[in-house]
Each structure stands twice: as structure tokens, then as C-alpha cells.
Curated annotation (Swiss-Prot):
Role according to the record: In addition to polymerase activity, this DNA polymerase exhibits 5'-3' exonuclease activity. Unlikely to have 3'-5' exonuclease activity due to absence of a 3'-5' exonuclease domain.
Gene3D superfamilies per the UniProt record, alphabetical: 3.30.70.370, 5' to 3' exonuclease, C-terminal subdomain (1.10.150.20), 5'-nuclease (3.40.50.1010), Ribonuclease H-like superfamily/Ribonuclease H (3.30.420.10), Taq DNA Polymerase, Chain T, domain 4 (1.20.1060.10)
Catalytic activity: DNA(n) + a 2'-deoxyribonucleoside 5'-triphosphate = DNA(n+1) + diphosphate
Protein name (record): DNA polymerase I, thermostable
Region (Polymerase): 410-832
GO molecular function, one term: DNA binding
Pfam families: 5_3_exonuc (PF01367), 5_3_exonuc_N (PF02739), DNA_pol_A (PF00476), Taq-exonuc (PF09281)
Keyword Secreted set for record: no
Source superkingdom: Bacteria
Length: 832
């Protein structure tokens, strides 16, 4: 039992940071975080967050220690040291350099000693500081440093908890002076410490509990159980080597003054954080003025002010306006009566401007959306999809207070506009497409679309009967009833009872997969699979659309109001939610019957306009392939022509199977379909599928050249872009892992095609909307390549002609754009 420790009053506290270990840990923990330029920065961000957390409580003196580039004495003593670790990731060295720059800008001491690892430097610093009367904390998750623990030296884990000698005893039943002995006995795969084969953690702890130390244990080998003794004797060299490698050095002659840390270089630190788009860290490092400190001013605000508002829920057609404020030039104006104050605004300028515009339209007010920082951020990088994320990235915090949101909008707009200076194509997209489109979408959301509720109720009953019939058929084929919605029960029936081959396993649990992809592959293996797929489709559509749609009808308008998301996809396409109209199947019978429920107002008709093969036409324009261009210019069927070239037969000899193969390849090329996937789609041998793809590129040689050029530019610039300059960053084009790199390549050459098609649709909507208003018609829905309008019966034909003309002439391409038009009382009949 130790005697009572004398009272200790430390001179101060020293914080030692295991820089290399912390950087590597955060690099893997936050994978995927990049700047809007596609620059990976996850290690820098994670390191800064962990360091900030530690700096708030610790460290009169702070020293950050990194591994030196040269090999350490351990590598020289044992060539296999740390050989079990994966090679350094390609993005890591550059981020490590940025981390060191951050440390310097923060005014923190930085140290690396050639020939020694950070562990030895940290250990020597800790012991030196302890000897000089300091309390020491080491920020690390490296267990090697547990051997340093004492009453004055503690380890601060990056997750925030403190590791002390008492913690070590409670967790492992070991003292700090036993830790290197324990590691020597058990070994460590990551450091390639061999240890003693056959001695695990439990046995090692028991031996140290009995003998106190490795030294005492080795002096009493003859008193050990024979099995343990034999293992140790057989691996004595490994044991001694492991101890030498596990024991950290505490005697490095380091000349360090544990003085108080220097002040950070605030201006350069701010510029550094802004360059890496660490907006939230500007606040945390105290480099931003708080919006709460802004001057209060009376309502109404001056013209051009940015608005901030708070809704009771995210859907503006259903929400209450809880608070409204505006900010301009450092002053915040809070509206005493939010609804009444809407009349004082000429435009909704600020984050989520479209939502406020929709709410105003609901209230009978014309409040067009103006500048929205969200749209600027989205054009800079399409991964910017939420106000929370944009605020965090570019300097601020998205709070629940309207005044703070208004001030944030003003600050973000200035920041983002500055970043877009000189980016003329992106600015053109903002001014001519995205900003005016937000006003169009606001009107579409506020207008909504009628639903045939009686029809949906009847359809629900009909589908319920069909589901019950399919369920009974599945039970008959299985030989007994079971819960069809239980994946575990379905797994047993398919693979254990019916003996179907298990194709794949789930990622999380490793169980045999019953996913849609697996069932599709097993479709021909047993009749039950087809029935299960049909059951799943019907239950999904019933629960997602048929049953919920009537409940989404607004009581005030009697119409369904879907939300159009302008900043949600990586390609620039619009998406919708509440409900998601994109997921209604186009080609299945039930999907088509659901579309039948979307109907025109009494005395009106729906006009459906669909761009025909727009992505293939865009591909023809972007690639400049003469054969592809000629087909569209001459108005011939692209799939028949492709089949004719691929199979070497006249057009007249192309049969349905040939055309289907050509169609699959035509669209498959856009998404980087592999020969393996094509062989599955067409049920043909792999070699034949490979030959098909090769013949396709021989038929359209400039398509392959364009793909290669796009990938080359993507690697060089870090991004790919549409015809109009919309960007998508693809840093993984340089990834070492083949599957990751190939996925990035597919993404890279698909985005310019899909994104250009999206840009054309958006531009057409912007041009068409005012013309429709002049004719008393409405724009209702935009789904995939389709636009749905509503027009008075007597003007429906004229509206259809106008819309077709605008959409086909939206922008001159090397090939004509073609729009298929239909008119009907419901969405389905308008498509037929």
C-alpha cells in the first residue's frame, strides 16, 4: 500500500498532442469531406475539432509532436516493425502538411525528431515536464503511452475522456509500469509486434498479476505451468524484441521551454480556415462576429435586406410562420407581426427564399424569391444541400432564431459571391437559370395538382386483394405460411428450405441477402421469386403512394403540393419530396395506374411534355460523333440504327431482340455499364456482351474519345462540367482502390450528359413560365425529362404547341431536341 502523496501544486499544465496519430485517426473517421474544389480535408477538419476541444480546458503550454520522415531506431532494429499497417493513403501527406500549417498559425510549438517516433518524443517531453513540476496531459488514442501514466501524467482520449492510473487498473487490472510488459506478451498486429504466440490478453494479465513484472516472470520460468513455459521459451527472442519495441524512450535530450503558448496569427488563421471552407471553425476559434451582437433596428427593413424566418415545419404550404426578420449592413430588423410584415417585403432574399415565397403565395401575396446563398453554394459544389451544412462550411451557424438567420444569409451571400467572382459560367447559371427557376418552382409548389381520391380508394382495395392473392401463392409455393416482410424468415425459406443459391451477403450482418438485386438474379430459379418481387412492388407502391396520397391533400386548396428540391442532386436535376414523384414507376402497370390519379381541374386539361431521348441527344452534341449526330438530324430511330451497325445488318433486318440489345447498350454507355452487367441484362455470355460494347464504340468512335477526354480533364481539374459549366467534383478519379476509381469514372462521364439535360429542362421552364402565365395556364410538375402543365380546355392545344416550341428551341445543339406531347384529363391519358 502506497503512502500518502504530498500535496502537489503544479507550475502549470502542459498539453502534448500526438499529431501524427490524431491526424491519421481523423483522416479515416471523416472520410469523404472535401472543399467545393474537391480537395480532401477530412483529416485537417477532424484534427482542428479535436485540438479545439482539448485547448478549451488544457494547456498553458502546448506542443504538437509529429513522426519524423526518417525511419526510427525501431525500424532499424526490426525490419518488420509496423509492417502490418496499410500503406499511407494518397491524400494523407498533403493533409498532414496542412495540419502542420494550422498548428503554426495557432501559435503552438511543433516538434519532430529524426530517428525517433512521436511516442518517444512525447514520453521524453512528458517526463521532463513532470520533473520540472508541471501537470501533463497527452492528447492521443495510442495505447503505447499508457506506460507513462502517473499522478501527474494523464492521457486525454480524442473522444474526451481522461485516462489515469486508476482508469487503467479498473479497465485492465494493470499498473502503468506493467503496460510495456503486457504489450510484449500479447503482441500487436498493427505494429507487427510478434509477442508470444498462444498467450492472449487474459493470460498475460493473469501472469503479471501473479509475478508483478516481466522481469520477475522470466526469473521464475521453472515455476510456471509447463504449457506457458514452453510457449515463452519457444518465442523468447520475439518476447524480448517486442518489449524493446513496446517500451517508449523517456530520455531524449530535448531542449524545450514549457513557456506559455504564443498568440495565434488571427488574420492568416482566418484566411486558412476560409480557404479550406471551415466556416464553423471561424466561430469556434473566435474569428467571427456573433450575429447576436448586431444592432437592433425597427421594422420595416431597407430595400435589399436579407430575410430570415422560422417555420413550424419544413413544408411551407403546411407551416405556420413563427418569426420573420431582416438584416442589412450590420443591423437586424425583427417583425413584430410576421404575417402582416410579409406585405412590407418586395422579395424574399436569403437562405431558403423559395420556402418563404411559397408561404406568401399561400397567403395570397406575391413575394418572389431573390438571391439565395444556398443556390450559390450549390453551384460551387453540389454536395452543399442543406443550410446547416452551408453555414458550417462557409462561416456561421444555422440557428432557430430569425434574426440570426437573416444576418447569416447576408454574411454567406457576400462570402459565396466573392468565391464565384471570375466564374462567369457559374454566375450565368445562377442569374439565368437557378435564381429565376426558384420563382417558377415556388409557383408550382403553391399551385399543386388535383387528385382523384375516390379512384385511389378503389385502387387501394383492388391492390390489397392482389397482395393477399400473391401472399397465398407464395405460402403455397413455400409449403407453409410465414411473415413475408421478415427478411430472416424469407432468408430461411429461400435458401434453407427451397435450396436456392445464396448470391450475396448483407454488409452489416453478413447474412444471406434477400435484396431486390439478388431476387432479380434468382427470378428464373424458382416460381416463388417472381411472386415475391410482385408482392414487394405492390406493397411498396400501396404504402408509399396509393394510401398516403389522399392524406397529403391540402384542406385549403384541395390539391396535392409536392416540394421541388433545387439543391438536392449531384447532377443538377430537380428532385421532389412529400411525395417523391420521381419514384413512381413509369413502365409498370401499377405505376401507370397511380399516374391516372393525378387529374386536371374541372374545365381544364393536363398537358404532358416529354423530352425524347434527351440524354442520347446531349451525348451526340458533346461527343461530336458524326454517326450519332446524323441519326438524330435525319429523324431516324437511334436504337434501330445502333443495332444495324452493331450486328452488321440492314435496318429492315433488325429484329426486336437486336433493337433491345442496342437500346440497352445505348443507355448503358451513359452510365458506364460493364460487360458483366450487360451480359446479365441481355442474358448472354460475358464474351458476347464485351463484343457488343466494342462494336458500339467502333460504330460511334468519338463517344469513346469524348469519354476518355472527359476523364482526363476530370483528373486534371478535379471536376467535370456540363455544357453550361455546372460542376461536379470527383476526387476519387485518382483513387488507388480500383472499385472506388471505376465508380468515380462512371460518375464523371455520366454527369456532363445528365447534368446538361437537367440544365436544358431548367432553362426551358424559366423561358416557358411567363408565356404560360400570359395564356392563363399553369406549370404543375417536373419529373425526370417530363413537364406537366394544366390549361383551360379551350386553350390546351395552343398551350401544348407553345410549350413544345419553347422546349425544343431552348438552346441550339448539333442535333434537334424532340418533345413528345400529350393532352388528357389525367396524367396517364396525357401520356398515352
Amino acid at each position: 500500500m502506497r503512502g500518502m502523496l504530498p500535496l502537489f501544486e503544479p507550475k502549470g499544465r502542459v498539453l502534448l498532442v500526438d499529431g501524427h496519430h490524431l491526424a491519421y485517426r481523423t483522416f479515416h473517421a471523416l472520410k469523404g469531406l472535401t472543399t467545393s474544389r474537391g480537395e480532401p480535408v477530412q483529416a485537417v477538419y477532424g484534427f482542428a475539432k479535436s485540438l479545439l476541444k482539448a485547448l478549451k480546458e488544457d494547456g498553458d503550454a502546448v506542443i504538437v509532436v509529429f513522426d519524423a520522415k526518417a525511419p526510427s531506431f525501431r525500424h532499424e532494429a526490426y525490419g518488420g516493425y509496423k509492417a502490418g499497417r496499410a500503406p499511407t493513403p494518397e491524400d494523407f501527406p498533403r493533409q498532414l502538411a496542412l495540419i502542420k500549417e494550422l498548428v503554426d498559425l495557432l501559435g503552438l510549438a511543433r516538434l519532430e525528431v529524426p530517428g525517433y517516433e512521436a511516442d518517444d518524443v512525447l514520453a521524453s517531453l512528458a517526463k521532463k515536464a513532470e520533473k520540472e513540476g508541471y501537470e501533463v496531459r497527452i492528447l492521443t488514442a495510442d495505447k503505447d503511452l499508457y506506460q507513462l501514466l502517473s499522478d501527474r501524467i494523464h492521457v486525454l482520449h480524442p473522444e474526451g475522456y481522461l485516462i489515469t492510473p486508476a482508469w487503467l487498473w479498473e479497465k485492465y487490472g494493470l499498473r502503468p509500469d506493467q503496460w510495456a510488459d503486457y504489450r510484449a506478451l500479447t503482441g500487436d498486429e498493427s505494429d507487427n509486434l510478434p509477442g508470444v504466440k498462444g498467450i492472449g490478453e487474459k493470460t498475460a494479465r493473469k501472469l503479471l498479476e501473479e509475478w508483478g513484472s516481466l522481469e520477475a516472470l522470466l526469473k521464475n520460468l521453472d515455476r510456471l505451468k509447463p504449457a506457458i513455459r514452453e510457449k515463452i521459451l519457444a518465442h523468447m527472442d520475439d518476447l524480448k524484441l517486442s518489449w524493446d519495441l513496446a517500451k517508449v524512450r523517456t530520455d531524449l535530450p530535448l531542449e524545450v521551454d514549457f513557456a506559455k503558448r504564443r498568440e495565434p496569427d488571427r488574420e492568416r488563421l482566418r484566411a486558412f480556415l476560409e480557404r479550406l471552407e471551415f466556416g464553423s471553425l471561424l466561430h469556434e476559434f473566435g474569428l467571427l462576429e456573433s450575429p447576436k451582437a448586431l444592432e437592433e433596428a425597427p421594422w420595416p427593413p431597407p430595400e435589399g435586406a436579407f430575410v430570415g424566418f422560422v417555420l413550424s415545419r419544413k413544408e411551407p404550404m403546411w407551416a405556420d410562420l413563427l418569426a420573420l426578420a431582416a438584416a442589412r449592413g450590420g443591423r437586424v430588423h425583427r417583425a413584430p407581426e410576421p404575417y402582416k410584415a410579409l406585405r412590407d417585403l418586395k422579395e424574399a432574399r436569403g437562405l431558403l427564399a423559395k420556402d418563404l415565397s411559397v408561404l406568401a403565395l399561400r397567403e395570397g401575396l406575391g413575394l418572389p424569391p431573390g438571391d439565395d446563398p444556398m443556390l450559390l453554394a450549390y453551384l460551387l459544389d453540389p454536395s452543399n444541400t442543406t443550410p446547416e451544412g452551408v453555414a458550417r462550411r462557409y462561416g456561421g451557424e444555422w440557428t432557430e432564431e430569425a434574426g440570426e438567420r437573416a444576418a447569416l444569409s447576408e454574411r454567406l451571400f457576400a462570402n459565396l459571391w466573392g468565391r464565384l467572382e471570375g466564374e462567369e459560367r457559374l454566375l450565368w447559371l445562377y442569374r439565368e437559370v437557378e435564381r429565376p427557376l426558384s420563382a417558377v418552382l415556388a409557383h408550382m409548389e403553391a399551385t399543386g395538382v388535383r387528385l382523384d381520391v375516390a379512384y385511389l380508394r378503389a385502387l387501394s382495395l383492388e391492390v390489397a386483394e392482389e397482395i393477399a392473392r400473391l401472399e397465398a401463392e407464395v405460402f403455397r409455393l413455400a409449403g407453409h405460411p410465414f411473415n413475408l416482410n421478415s427478411r430472416d424468415q424469407l432468408e430461411r425459406v429461400l435458401f434453407d428450405e427451397l435450396g436456392l443459391p445464396a448470391i450475396g451477403k448483407t454488409e452489416k450482418t453478413g447474412k444471406r441477402s434477400t435484396s431486390a438485386a439478388v431476387l432479380e438474379a434468382l427470378r428464373e430459379a424458382h416460381p416463388i421469386v417472381e411472386k415475391i418481387l410482385q408482392y414487394r412492388e405492390l406493397t411498396k407502391l400501396k404504402s408509399t403512394y396509393i394510401d398516403p396520397l389522399p392524406d397529403l391533400i391540402h384542406p385549403r386548396t384541395g390539391r396535392l403540393h409536392t416540394r421541388f428540391n433545387q439543391t438536392a442532386t449531384a447532377t443538377g436535376r430537380l428532385s421532389s419530396s412529400d411525395p417523391n414523384l420521381q419514384n413512381i414507376p413509369v413502365r409498370t402497370p401499377l405505376g401507370q395506374r397511380i399516374r391516372r390519379a393525378f387529374i386536371a381541374e374541372e374545365g381544364w386539361l393536363l398537358v404532358a411534355l416529354d423530352y425524347s431521348q434527351i440524354e442520347l441527344r446531349v451525348l451526340a452534341h458533346l461527343s461530336g460523333d458524326e454517326n450519332l449526330i446524323r441519326v438524330f438530324q435525319e429523324g431516324r430511330d437511334i436504337h434501330t440504327e445502333t443495332a444495324s451497325w452493331m450486328f452488321g445488318v440492314p435496318r429492315e433486318a433488325v429484329d426486336p431482340l437486336m433493337r433491345r440489345a442496342a437500346k440497352t447498350i445505348n443507355f448503358g454507355v451513359l452510365y458506364g455499364m460493364s460487360a458483366h452487367r450487360l451480359s446479365q441484362e441481355l442474358a448472354i455470355p460475358y464474351e458476347e456482351a464485351q463484343a457488343f460494347i466494342e462494336r458500339y464504340f467502333q460504330s460511334f468512335p468519338k463517344v469513346r474519345a469524348w469519354i476518355e477526354k472527359t476523364l482526363e480533364e476530370g483528373r486534371r481539374r478535379g471536376y467535370v462540367e456540363t455544357l453550361f459549366g455546372r460542376r461536379r467534383y470527383v476526387p476519387d478519379l485518382e483513387a488507388r482502390v480500383k472499385s472506388v476509381r471505376e465508380a468515380a469514372e462512371r460518375m464523371a462521364f455520366n454527369m456532363p450528359v445528365q447534368g446538361t439535360a437537367a440544365d436544358l429542362m431548367k432553362l426551358a421552364m424559366v423561358k416557358l413560365f411567363p408565356r404560360l402565365e400570359e395564356m392563363g395556364a399553369r406549370m404543375l410538375l417536373q419529373v425526370h425529362d417530363e413537364l406537366v402543365l394544366e390549361a383551360p380546355k379551350e386553350r390546351a392545344e395552343a398551350v401544348a404547341r407553345l410549350a413544345k416550341e419553347v422546349m425544343e428551341g431552348v438552346y441550339p445543339l448539333a442535333v434537334p431536341l424532340e418533345v413528345e406531347v400529350g393532352i388528357g384529363e389525367d396524367w396517364l391519358s396525357a401520356k398515352e
